[in-house]
Amino acid sequence: MLLAMRLLDFLFAIRPLVLVPAWSFFLLGAAAAPDDSSRTWLRLALFTLAMIGVYLVNQIVDLESDRINDKGFFLQRGIFTPRQYAGAAVASLALALGVAAATENAPGLLAVAVGLGLAYSVPPVRLAARAGLDLGANAAGYGLLAPWLGAGAGTSAPGTAFLASTTLAVAAVFMHTTLLDLEGDRRTGKRTIGLVLGPGRSRALAALLAVLAAIAAIASADRDLGVAAGVLAVGSAAAAFRPARVSSRSVCVGGTAVYALAAAAAWPLFAAAVLALALATRIYYARRFGMRYPAL
């Protein structure tokens, strides 16, 4: 029973719901430029392993800011130690990159994604604490590299307009993400784009980025992408002009949801998987910590 609880704790310690945006953009890229299905699913598994490693490193570095922002549960409560996280991260990254190289399944692009993810978190580079570079790193990681990996990193990569739209969309949502973490970032010395611009200008920039994402999606002629980008543009504009009615959290949750639905339009089982994961997460956090998570 104790071992089962430890395994369950670790499953949720990697924050599986945080993987949903990465999966969504990966699958959108896979749908836009189909590759051999067996290689696509293997690449998704390797991408997931790599992102788990990156997220574990991020949690180690952000231990204190997550505590302040009330986002930490496992390191902060002593359920796991930073050393255990580090060991798991090394194993995940080594396995992902090793198998990608052995199977010649986009190893170079996966390595770039891992390098960017680590540069985002790890000092002295730590792009997460550098205003502007934090935005660029997130947009490039989720909006550019994830769909490109989904397509297989080959000559069948999604078109320029498609990748421009996904990159701009991620940037728009990220602007609101930084607003949710202002207090913790300020107290731990992180100089994020949200802190530098402030809430008003951050919301305005997010709206502009979302509108540009919608324009690029229309140019890409991808219907599902266009619908998702259009919804994000409307939500972002509403948050900019009526922030009291449309919160940054609503934009983050809604933006994640519409792109997950766009991915599910091409991969229907993805919707069922995300719903099952959300339900399992809600039950786990209620029973383990007595709290409501995820909360809308």
Q: How would you name each of these model-derived features?
A:
Residues M1-L296:
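Multi-pass alpha-helical membrane architecture of UbiA-family
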